[in-house]
Regions:
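DNA-recognition alpha helix
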Residues: 25-36
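Amphipathic alpha-helical dimerization/coiled-coil segments
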Residues: 81-91
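A short, conserved structural fragment
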Residues: 52-60
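Short capping segments at the starts of secondary-structure elements
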Residues: 8, 17-26
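Short alpha-helical "packing" element that flanks the helix-turn-helix/winged-helix DNA-binding module
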Residues: 9-14, 44
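Short, Lys/Arg-rich nucleic-acid/phosphate-binding segment
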Residues: 7, 61-67
């Protein structure tokens, strides 16, 4: 696994984007709901930037909103992590 998915927050972002595209604020709200705490915008957008720079997430503009989606590479990495995690839990 590359270092870009070693962060729990980045993995969670990829998991939330699996199968759907989300506006940044909706994505941030879902993460905050899952974590049970507020996420600093700088931290959230920093994680998105790393994922986009590494080719795991792509952005498109829809009106005035940025919409994020998982790329094929991001989906592959997420499935690799899921497979690894499943193997660990079966042991």
């Amino acid at each position: 696994m590359t270092k870009f998915l070693q962060s729990g927050r980045r993995r969670d972002i990829c998991a939330l984007l699996a199968g759907e595209q989300l506006q940044a604020q909706a994505l941030k709200s879902r993460l905050e709901s899952h974590d049970g705490e507020r996420i600093e915008p700088k931290s959230f957008y920093g994680a998105l930037d790393v994922l986009e720079d590494s080719g795991f997430v792509e952005t498109r503009t829809d009106g005035i909103h940025d919409v994020y989606a998982l790329t094929e590479a991001g989906e592959r990495r997420l499935h690799e992590h899921y497979d690894w995690l499943s193997d660990q839990l079966q042991d």
